[in-house]
Structures are given as C-alpha cells and as structure tokens.
Amino acid sequence: MTKYVWFKIVSVVVIVGILIAICVIEDRLVITSFEKVNDYCYEIEEVVKKNGIVNGEVASLVDNLEYNWKVNESALCFLVNHKSIEQMAIEIVRLKTYIDEEEPIEFLVSLELIKHYVETFQHFMGANFHNIL
C-alpha cells in the first residue's frame, strides 16, 4: 500500500475516534446533569413528605436545585436548542411560587413534571448514531 492509502485510513480512523469521544463526553454530561436534578427532586420529595412544603429546608433545596439547573443548563444549551429544555427552569420557578403560596398539591405536581422532563430529555439528548453520522 502506498503512503496515500495509509494516510486515508489513518485519517478516517482518527475522525471516527474523535466523533466517538465527543458522543461519549456528551452522553456523560447529559447523564450527570440530569442525575443531579433527579437526586434533588427525590430529596425534596422526602423532606416534603416528612415536614410539608412550608419549611426552610425545602426552600433551600429548591434554591440548590435552581442553582444546579442554571449551571448545567448553560452547558446543555450547546447540545440542544435552549427552548427544548426551557420548561425545566419554568417548573423550578413554579416550585418556589407554590412554596410561597403554600400549595402542596401543585408543588408535588410540579415536582413530578420535573422528574418527567428529566426522563424524557435523557431520551432525546443522549448519544446515538445520528450524532455520529
């Protein structure tokens, strides 16, 4: 084989390797971001079951959830359109509103919506063959 053929083979292997590495990094970023949000949701849910929503601990956890989401959302916006994941931030703001208005049913519904968004976003944001091609 000539040098030209070897160069083409090595180039293709390097490009495919880079694409695979990018997809793996993307997948890890998405998974860790949404796992943190999911962990906060379950922690908030446990505290609400024990003490109700009118509690400083719940407000603090929701603030932590909001901060965590803002940090991760900026990184996720490089992977998808911001409007696709904007609903998550809206629901987090609603959580804070429901704490102030002392509406536990709406609070829990909003928390369930956040968990639902986490699950659905993981399906369309993960690495797949379309990303590689």
Provide a role label for each language-model segment:
Residues 1-7:
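N-terminal positive-inside, membrane-proximal cytosolic segments immediately preceding the first
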Residues 41-75:
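Short extracytoplasmic
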Residues 123-133:
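Short, charged, intrinsically disordered terminal tails
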Residues 8-24:
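Hydrophobic membrane-insertion alpha-helices, especially the h-region
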Residues 19-36:
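Transmembrane signal-anchor/signal-peptide helices with a preference for the extracytoplasmic
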Residues 77-125:
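Structured, soluble extracytoplasmic/luminal domains of envelope-associated proteins
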